[in-house]
Amino acid sequence: AHGIPAKNQFENWQDALNAGKIADAVLNATQDEMHHDSAIAAMRAGYEMLLEKPIATTLSETLHIIQTAEKTGRMLMVCHVLRYTDFFQKVNQIIKSGQLGQIINISHTENVSYFHMAHSYVRGSWRNLEVSTPMILAKCCHDLDLLYWFLDEKCTHLSSVGNLRHFTEENAPVGAPERCTDGCPAAETCPFYAPRIYLESIPIKQAVSRASNPFIRGFGKLTLNQPGIAKALGKLIPPLQTLTEYSGWPRNTITESPQSDGAVMEALKTGPYGRCVYHCDNNVVDHQIVSMVFPSGITVTLTMHGHSHQEGRTLRIDGSRATLLGKFSYSQAWIEVHEHLTNQIERYTFPSEVDQTAGHGGGDAGLLE
């Protein structure tokens, strides 16, 4: 799919490194628990490295990776891509300009959509602490990085509470089988019903129907309300076909043939993503709050939860002269600055992820550039 020659295709990272140095740098996107060993080996083999977040699963492994980078002289860069979005660049610029006055409090929320939570943290690779990292690290190290970047201070005090409230056996609908494909009596009423998420891609189409671009928003609504007409239009206008015959995330993570409904259904019948969300081996939290105090007296709350109708981050920064409100979501991205003295409002809008079809609101491309 990516035009990689067969000689440079490998089953695992060990085979890739054992093949000898074939490039100047590696992009290490292995699973969290593999970061330490693969990163150490790659730097010792002479590669510069862009490492997917989080750096590692423990503090000792993180420090070992950093020390190895220093010892080998290799460049080590972490994929905190949100710093490179136009949205968060603007937030940072407004803070540093002094327009908000003294920063008093920041309320930052990571609203993980209900189907993303089910896909990644209930059915998927980050569901269990024994095989991956805590959700606050796996999902919110982006946000913690942003807070340090905004404030240029290190937190001095913090506390945190959270738990797994919903995705448990006791919340299963009466008669719910182990798999959604085994005749679940709650198929029509359960928002986590796997065929609706992966075969019909309803949550993705709903997100597109909320896009800020009116043309994209209208077509998203058409795919939901008149799927037959939308499919016919998609054949005439190829860019629209990417939605009517959707094969992107999360569908493309459960099978090697995401264009095939048959392959997707087979994955749901046999793989982890067809499991009932109430009958999985998940043990990570589905909501958590972190409270922080910084040396200057600034207080910060970071809230993360996996029950949002819409994926994205919301932000409120209260200063002595103005309040900043922001929304950075799959469908919309905007910032407002409300000035205390004049009552004036400055509003900035940005292309959303769906508007520009770019990962992390343009942050992925921004980091690589």
What residues fall within each predicted segment?
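A structural signal for well-ordered alpha-helical segments within the folded catalytic domains
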Residues: 36-40, 63, 85, 89, ...
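Predominantly a Rossmann-like dinucleotide-binding segment in NAD(P)-dependent oxidoreductases
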Residues: 82-267, 273
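Hydrophobic residues in well-ordered beta-strands that form the structural core
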Residues: 28, 51-52, 78, 107, ...
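Beta-loop-alpha module in the N-terminal Rossmann-like domain of NAD(P)-dependent dehydrogenases
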Residues: 5-68
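Rossmann-fold dehydrogenase core element
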Residues: 64-81, 101-108
